[in-house]
Amino acid sequence: MLTFQQMILTLQAYWDRQGCALLQPIDLEVGAGTSHVHTFLRAIGPEPWRAAYVQPSRRPKDGRYGENPNRLQHYYQYQVVLKPAPENILVLYLGSLEALGLDLKQNDIRFVEDDWENPTLGAWGLGWEVWLNGMEVTQFTYFQQVGGIDCKPITGEITYGIERLAMYLQKVENVYDLVWTEWVENGETRRLTYGDVYHQNEVEQSTYNFEHSNTEILFRHFAEHEGEAKRLMGNGDGADAAAETGTRLALPAYEQVLKAAHTFNLLDARGAISVTERAAYIGRIRNLSRQVAQAYYDSREALGFPMCGQRDGARA
């Protein structure tokens, strides 16, 4: 049996052999691995890119106080980004399942059409859910547009739901029963479970998300992050320096967009935003994402798209 961390190490080793740069998660609160700068921005423009990483993901509304066996407000995704998307991407994915010890002939693996869209990032793609014996464990996406910019070439994204896949591999019904790691100490096998690591966090973060977050402070934070992103894009209050020099700082601005997006998610979980306001807030974040995407594209174009000379992909 693979432990939770052995499963991650196995995926790391497998995608390393496929030429991926093994990166670290972005050190900000995000709702999915797609929001990582090395997926969202790297999908823009013609430069090749291959990367893989674990991404802790937060979705405040999905918290259940640690009482639901398979629903979490904090969970993990394993993200693989291949640009341009190789013709054998499905073969590569199935190979990763075999590396995890799955017998493809003994298990029911289905690809169910499920096109993907992220309104706040102005991104969408054609894709499939991957179902393993009736349970969704992976999302496949061929990015068509990111930040309002058409993807040329197409980027292939593979997003594993690590907890769900691990629950099947370990044959447990409750995520908190997953074996995170095990070792032998004084002749006895010791185990650390997912619940040991994260159950208290789920209880307390759910309590904060739904009951104790300060909406007044959160609304102020949203306005601050939005304003800072605008300033770094050369518009809004205090944007004179960026506007005069023509310097738009896409990467710092994108971090502000991500902070604004997470703040919005906290407000949404708290029930502080009406249905009408929700659409308006999403539109504001999407507008910033598009500005950042264009600024990033322009900055890479000004450099002559330097990674286009790398024939076999891009390793960091």
From Swiss-Prot:
InterPro entries in the record: aa-tRNA-synth_II/BPL/LPL, Gly-tRNA-synth_heterodimer, Gly-tRNA_ligase_asu
* Localization per record: Cytoplasm
Q: Which GO terms describe its molecular function?
A: ATP binding; glycine-tRNA ligase activity
* EC number in record: 6.1.1.14
Primary localisation category = cytoplasm
Query: Top-level EC class, please?
Result: ligase
Q: Which domain of life is it from?
A: Bacteria
Q: Which GO terms describe its cellular component?
A: cytosol
Q: Which reaction does it catalyse?
A: tRNA(Gly) + glycine + ATP = glycyl-tRNA(Gly) + AMP + diphosphate
Q: Does the keyword Nucleotide-binding apply?
A: yes
GO annotations under biological process? glycyl-tRNA aminoacylation
Q: What would be one Pfam family of this protein?
A: tRNA-synt_2e
User: Per UniProt, which keywords does this protein have?
Assistant: Aminoacyl-tRNA synthetase, ATP-binding, Cytoplasm, Ligase, Nucleotide-binding, Protein biosynthesis
Q: How does it assemble?
A: Tetramer of two alpha and two beta subunits.
Question: Which protein family is it in?
Answer: Belongs to the class-II aminoacyl-tRNA synthetase family.
Q: What is this protein called?
A: Glycine--tRNA ligase alpha subunit
